[in-house]
Regions:
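Rossmann-like NAD(P)-binding element
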Residues: 14-36
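Conserved acidic residues
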Residues: 10, 21, 45-46, 88
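Active-site-lining helix/loop region of Rossmann-like oxidoreductase modules
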Residues: 18, 85-87, 99-195
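Receiver (REC) domain switch-region micro-motif
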Residues: 23, 48, 193
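Single conserved hydrophobic/aromatic residue that forms the stacking wall/gate
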Residues: 2-13
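Short glycine-rich anion-binding loops that position phosphate/pyrophosphate groups of nucleotides
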Residues: 28-30, 54-55, 95-97
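Catalytic helix-loop patch of NAD(P)-dependent Rossmann-fold dehydrogenases
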Residues: 65-111
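Rossmann-fold NAD(P)-binding glycine/threonine-rich loop
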Residues: 32-85
Length: 195
């Protein structure tokens, strides 16, 4: 079914939420629109698992890689109080490029790494493109992806952080420096990580 027919009025959200157990959210909208639609679903008692970046820094929304920070799910209690829900909530996943190396950082955490240098090689699917849509990428590399470096340096610190007093305290170390390149690969990101 076309997603455009699923997105729209508040009535549509109420109607759809009564027919589903939960919602996977991966939409191409502004951050404000995404926040509004995800909260609307949560307020209808429908759990939302989001691929979008809109709620990644909302204080009571857990950004989870379950193998690393399942304790962050406890934030959902605080979020439900804010939303006035018993079942509905929002949880997000981190940026796709950090999922490949954050588990390795977590494994090294006990050794106290001070600095991490990462270079990501990101497929065009990460930009929502195919080679048909973006023929200029065939045999081409883009050496800078706007906004990706900042996300790749900050989001792991939230994932590796600790839950304290109902919010996430960011990990203070390691210091992460990242360079993000777009490469002529359809699917799959790669990261070179130096700890």
């Amino acid at each position: 079914e076309m997603t455009s027919s699923l997105v729209g009025s508040e009535m549509c959200i109420r109607d759809r939420s009564s027919t589903v157990d939960f919602v996977f959210s991966a939409v191409d909208m502004t951050k404000d629109e995404i926040k509004a639609i995800e909260e609307a679903y949560a307020k209808t008692e429908t759990p939302v698992v989001s691929n979008n970046s809109a709620h990644r820094w909302t204080k009571d929304v857990p950004m989870v890689v379950p193998e690393i920070n399942a304790a962050h799910f406890d934030l959902i209690k605080t979020q439900k109080e804010r939303l006035g829900t018993t079942r509905g909530f929002i949880a997000v996943k981190p940026n796709c490029s950090i999922q490949s190396y954050t588990p390795a950082l977590a494994a090294w955490k006990e050794f106290g790494p001070k600095e991490v240098v990462v270079t990501t090689y990101q497929a065009i699917s990460g930009a929502g493109k195919t080679f048909k849509d973006w023929p200029e990428m065939i045999e081409n590399i883009i050496p800078y992806i706007g906004g990706e470096e900042e996300k790749s340096e900050k989001e792991p610190l939230r994932v590796l952080g600790t839950l304290e007093n109902g919010e996430i305290k960011l990990a203070e170390e390691p210091k992460i420096t990242c360079q993000c390149l777009r490469v002529p690969v359809l699917n799959g990101h790669t990261a070179a990580v130096f700890i």
